[in-house]
UniProtKB/Swiss-Prot annotation:
Example GO biological process: cellular response to oxidative stress
Functional note: Destroys superoxide anion radicals which are normally produced within the cells and which are toxic to biological systems.
Protein name: Superoxide dismutase [Mn], mitochondrial
Free-text description of this protein's post-translational modifications in UniProt: Nitrated under oxidative stress. Nitration coupled with oxidation inhibits the catalytic activity. Acetylation at Lys-98 decreases enzymatic activity. Deacetylated by SIRT3 upon exposure to ionizing radiations or after long fasting.
Organism of provenance: Macaca mulatta (Rhesus macaque)
Any Pfam family: Sod_Fe_C
Subunit structure: Homotetramer.
Reaction catalysed by this enzyme: 2 superoxide + 2 H(+) = H2O2 + O2
EC assignment: 1.15.1.1
Length: 198
């Protein structure tokens, strides 16, 4: 059974950039719902497998993708944020960003633009293309998980579902995106980058 991971900081730790009310609802209600629904879906899937019921297996796949993706995405998202975040990455990750995007500022602009441009709900991502050995920006709709749908390894995810910002930023997604850069945990993103380069 999947379980809701603990946050590595308090709900109010990312204020003023993301307020405690948003963090509490986002983690304890939204992420928890993905986890619960994923467990229920996997149980039904096991039953369908045991019966050899392929039609039922296919019917369950959208729920598996949505709730499984929601669990994967949020588990990455919480660790990508930190009350001691912000600034720029250092070392190899910064070098790779400069190599693949020209500069850190250009990278920030591109990831912000991709995230602002998500229609409806979804995610903006910095991913690693293992085949090319390059960093890549991508946007995914809904809860589509980056690696499962594009093959890119997720390094940094920005949640642009309205539940991630509406209580504080209303419908002004660009203001939320401007603020989130102040709490990006570059140590975590760097760890992910170093791990996928091995």
């Amino acid at each position: 059974k999947h379980s809701l991971p603990d946050l590595p900081y308090d709900y109010g730790a990312l204020e003023p950039h993301i307020n405690a009310q948003i963090m509490q609802l986002h983690h304890s209600k939204h992420h928890a719902a993905y986890v619960n629904n994923l467990n229920v879906t996997e149980e039904k899937y096991q039953e369908a497998l045991a019966k050899g019921d392929v039609t039922a297996q296919i019917a369950l796949q959208p729920a598996l993708k949505f709730n499984g993706g929601g669990h994967i995405n949020h588990s990455i998202f919480w660790t990508n944020l930190s009350p001691n975040g912000g600034g720029e990455p250092k070392g190899e990750l910064l070098e790779a960003i400069k190599r693949d995007f020209g500069s850190f500022e250009k990278f920030k602009e591109k990831l912000t633009a991709a995230s602002v441009g998500v229609q409806g709900s979804g995610w903006g991502w910095l991913g690693f293309n293992k085949e090319r050995g390059q960093l890549q920006i991508a946007a995914c709709p809904n809860q589509d998980p980056l690696q499962g749908t594009t093959g890119l390894i997720p390094l940094l995810g920005i949640d642009v579902w309205e539940h991630a910002y509406y209580l504080q930023y209303k419908n002004v997604r660009p203001d939320y995106l401007k603020a989130i850069w102040n709490v990006i945990n570059w140590e975590n993103v760097t760890e992910r980058y170093m791990a996928c380069k091995k």
